Amino acid sequence: MDHTFWLTPGHASEPDSWYAGTSPQGLFRSEDGGITWAPLPAVNDDPQFREWMGSVQDGTPDGPKLHSIIVDPRDPSHLIFAMSGGGVHESRDVGRSWRTLIEGLEVVEGFDAATVSCHDPHCVRLCPSNPDRLYQQNHCGIYRLDRPGDTWQRIGRKMPKRVGDIGFPMVVHPRDADIAWVFPMDGTTVWPRTSPEGRPAAYVTRNAGRTWQRLDQGLPEGQAWWTVKRQAMTADAQPSPALYLGTTSGELWIGRDEGARWSNVARHLPEIYAVEVAEIA
């Protein structure tokens, strides 16, 4: 293991439990508030582990990693996680066994979609208001999965063609499962990991991906050659949620009224990898 990449608290009924995703890919569980950790061997000892890791040039810290660990709020035994270089997986027995959730997902042209290691989910989110719905920002588009189905639908094809549906973060509304936000990056063959045309914007869907609206009021109108990483965008739980994002150029932005109005609140920070928001009583 090179480093811990993702931390997720366990189910509300298990207040001392935590899950950790690592780079290279590994999944660990703590039952004492993080004092001690135990690997989940069904993941860490999987014979495909070396394939998930990729080659030397795909190494840490920006290469393979296990992320997007989700605990079903209705069932502490039901877990979902994703791997960059290993697809999306689901367990219904606290990680003792797993099944893949890659049906319907596309891969880079020339690769085999039936090969799990060819899949590169960037961020997966479960809707708090409807835990049977998942959204995913993938290396190859934006997707939605509605249970009990097992097939992802690519909902990013309705994004503007000049922008595309490639990016890293995925944010869902705390109370409306039809509302979700993404932050696209330049997904051309160059893959510069910057905003398309240097004009950053969030996009929102209010109908589960049938249409998308650009949200850029207050954001730079040009020459903003940055993007947002998978953990660096989130929303609060206010009646009209605000969005919060950190950029690869070290800026922190708030998008009030569900992202309708953006303002900068900090500059000249290091590259921002994660943003969280908490209400202080």
Which role fits each region the language model picked out?
Residues 1-281:
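Extracellular glycan-interacting surfaces
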